[in-house]
Curated annotation (Swiss-Prot):
The UniProt record lists the keyword Kinase: yes
Source organism of this protein record: Danio rerio (Zebrafish)
Positions with a binding annotation for ATP: I102, G103, R104, G105, S106, F107, S108, R109, V110, K125
Taxonomic lineage: Eukaryota, Metazoa, Chordata, Craniata, Vertebrata
Region (Disordered): 35-80, 376-422
GO cellular component: cytoplasm
Keyword Hydrolase tagged: no
Domain Protein kinase, residue spans: 96-353
Bias-annotated ranges (Polar residues): 46-62
Biased composition (Basic and acidic residues): 405-414
Protein name (record): Serine/threonine-protein kinase H1 homolog
Cited InterPro entries: Kinase-like_dom_sf, Prot_kinase_dom, Protein_kinase_ATP_BS, Ser/Thr_kinase_AS
Signal peptide as annotated in the record: none
Enzyme Commission number(s): 2.7.11.1
Amino acid sequence: MGCRTSKVLPEPPGDVQLDLVKKVEPHQTDVYKNFIKYDGGGEKTGSPSPQGQSQAVAKVSQSPPPANDQPEPADSHRKKVAKYRAKFDPRVTAKYDIKALIGRGSFSRVVRVEHRSTRQPYAIKMIETRYREGREVCESELCVLRRVRHTNIIQLMEVFETAERVYMVMELATGGELFDRIITRGSFTERDATRVLQMVLDGVKYLHTLGITHRDLKPENLLYYHPGADSKIMITDFGLASTRKKGDECLMKTTCGTPEYIAPEILVRKPYTNAVDMWALGVISYILLSGTMPFEDDNRMRLYRQILKGKYSFSGEPWPSVSNLAKDFIDRVLTVDPNERLSAGQALKHPWIVSMAASSSMKNLHRSISQNLLKRASSRCHSTKSSQSTRSSRSTKSSKARRLREKELRELNRRYQQQCNG
């Protein structure tokens, strides 16, 4: 959901170099430990980052204050905000005016800020690097974001470091998550779907060219830049990303991802390539056209077996109204064999994407898609098994529920090997 009062950052100029990203030497004293819980701005991060890391790209929603809290006096609120700002590293507050706490996690806080000179809004993500997992996430994100410059990938603007914390100044996305936008729209056609996928595929192709594999592509990590109808989509949250010199040729082994979006080759612990991102995009494409998941089961082992078989259906609404070309696109990315799966470059050349569904029906699929999305969201609200990354969650409880459990994967791999050996 968008923030009507937020300014919109201009598109980054093509000639801006990566020297925008600079390192500030560690400060000798570390100044703050506590944060106010609610700043009244009604904002939260667009998606979780690994191990509870709040993402630096903000999704803005109309969340009310905690139900049990009475509105506090204005003077008391101002004092609390002033005290909160005073705890920030002085080099940060000298340059940025802290406006609101918009996200939090086990090892991070995210605040909405304004540049004091330009008045441009940004998000600052603070990561506690004294913890091992915090350091790992920070290193992963910085390794990627310092290298990339693409219109469909969130941009890192500046970095401040202290002995125990890192502050990443990033673009602020105010347009909300991909599927939130679809639900609020009155219309959604196949052509609209191809516009979204073109932008995401452009970003993924760019990442893969640099040898970067995201490894956690999902709707929560695809944010709209601003609330306008012409907003671009941006890929965010690189806490699980892997960086290699040549992404297609280098094999990865780490078991990570979000269960419903994870590729079969990861589940059976085979060395894998950046083709895992394309599998996740296949899942996203399926949801984009139907509002439902191709693979879903509350029982994790049954879910994994579905993924390994790669069997899904095009039954139920609105699939009868979806073109065969769109279904062919999904079939070619949701291919169990990664060698047969379309690459990002090949996917961009698929007739359905190239023609922007020109030969498809322009029937409005919005009603069925939004109803299915809302139905799924409602059912997930009553379960702790929300779609969180293996190293991320909005709460400890949901994190444990959604983690790729080592015991389950060992059992799955044992059964898979038994089947292969006959």
